[in-house]
Amino acid sequence: MSTTATITQQAERIVPLNVEANKYPKPLQPSGALDKFTFEESTPVIGREYPKVNLVDDIINAPNADELIRDLAITISQRGVVFFRAQDNLTDEQHKQLVHRLGELTNKPKDSTLHIHPLLNSTNEFGVDDNEISVISSNVEFFQDRIKDRDDRKQGAASWHSDIQFEQYPADYTSLRLTKLPAGGGDTLWASGYELYDRYSDPYRKFFEGLTATFSGEGFLRARDARPDHYKVYEEPRGNPANIGDELKAIHPVVRTNPVTGWKSIFAIGNFPKRINELSERESREILESLYKRIEQNHDLQVRFRWRSPNDIAFWDNRSAFHSATNDYDGLGERTGHRAVGIGEKPYLDPNSLSRTEALKRA
């Protein structure tokens, strides 16, 4: 039996492309608890900013905190990414617990908690003393070929991605709080997987909906193999009992349904999807490159966020949004942040779910 056939059979067993209709969660609706806060839509398609909200005082410690956090999660899932400024009184513990509660209050699996990154955790010298907080630093060099790595980053090569797609149960919500900013540059961009799906014709959508992809975190394994005395892979459960070992490989649908909104999103974007299992190697490469180029070439499905002050913070939904850092700050200082990543459900496609545009027309 060919390798392709074997992978396809595995995908049919593993990926819940079609399950009983009553097993699918119903989309969630906000209560309106956040409506009292001033906000700005960053673009028509993606992004929202609450310029005056203090997360600790106004949300975490509010009498109706659960209601507010649930509505915040729904808003993040609908808008893709949500921003807050200068959260100077937010601790790492509050930061990560807020990310976890976003998922809990929107019905993520009970055994899904917070992700422990395979490399960026407290077992390595660049981590903090907390496995559930990853330090994102411009000083971290995974690979020995610094000239090539720097050139790739300058060109923006392979930079759009969704967090930890290589896990059996990948991320739901991620939050990044920058603690140290360069003198200039270092913006982050997000792109809408909902809008990417919407921009294809119905025949293309149906084609994509029948596909699965193999996702791999092989880059982290290369880093470990290059410097085994320096990097170690965390092999214990990483936020879910199924996320174990050092294989860092999973099969997921190319199109998935976001359980919070009920909207379809392209999911196979970035460095982690390595192969579309039902296609030839050449066809797979062409499709993955085409999806990626759609993100790169359509600025109107993106939002760009300028980090203005330490402790600016972003929350996004990895199931339907992709992000990319801008590496344009060489010689302008260090860029450092603390990241917390929640673990969600195993990706699935509800064939009766709608696109974002279809759902908004019906609302």
What is each model feature region?
Residues 2-78, 85-315, 319-363:
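Fe(II)/2-oxoglutarate oxygenase catalytic core
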